[in-house]
Amino acid sequence: MDNAILNSELIAIQAGNIIVYNYDGGNREYISASTEYLAVGVGIPANSCLDAPGSHKAGYAILRSEDLSSWEYVPDHRGETVYSIDTGNPEEITVLGDYPENTTTIAPLTPYDKWDGEKWVVDTEAQHSAAVEAAETKRQSLIDTAMDSISLIQLKLRAGRKLTQAETTQLNSVLDYIDELNAMDLTTAPDLNWPEKQLSTAS
């Protein structure tokens, strides 16, 4: 079959086949080439052109220029993950173009990393504060658990009932354990040696 012949307005003045290069109507990204049959008086399909794009380049997408007059290469980082240099939060890139401002492709190693302009550095003060806070939470949880373990003994004491020797031993053991917890210097967190609770059971 003969090739189509077009006028200056890209309307066929002779019917036939023609190769067109299609691009997305939204972001103008090159999609594919196709052979189209044009009858006389018919133009090329929407979002297509006659000039071929250049060859593929790694890391780039091929887009039709904004004025639709040529092809251009645009950075393509879609699918990559970048990290906010302000918060360290990850973000997956879903659009064409350069990396977003105030991001880096380098992942922070800890929740306490701060960006120094070139790399992540650990904010040791924030890291230590978090460790101390976690230790305080753990200590209170251990104290609460210990207190729960002697709640029945405390109830008997409040009722004026006499404790058995085993109950007295358990009560003193738990109170000693709580004293050890309260005496801990948590400012050295996370390098702490937690006391072990003596497992004695009242009978």
From Swiss-Prot:
UniProt cross-references to InterPro entries, sorted A to Z: Phage_T4_Gp38_tail_assem, TFA_Chaperone
Cystine residue pairs: none
Source superkingdom: Bacteria
Keywords, alphabetical: Plasmid
Family to which the UniProt record says this protein belongs: Belongs to the tfa family.
PANTHER family for the chain: PROPHAGE TAIL FIBER ASSEMBLY PROTEIN HOMOLOG TFAE-RELATED, PROPHAGE TAIL FIBER ASSEMBLY PROTEIN HOMOLOG TFAE-RELATED-RELATED
Record's protein name: Tail fiber assembly protein homolog
Species the sequence originates in: Escherichia coli
Gene name linked to the record: T
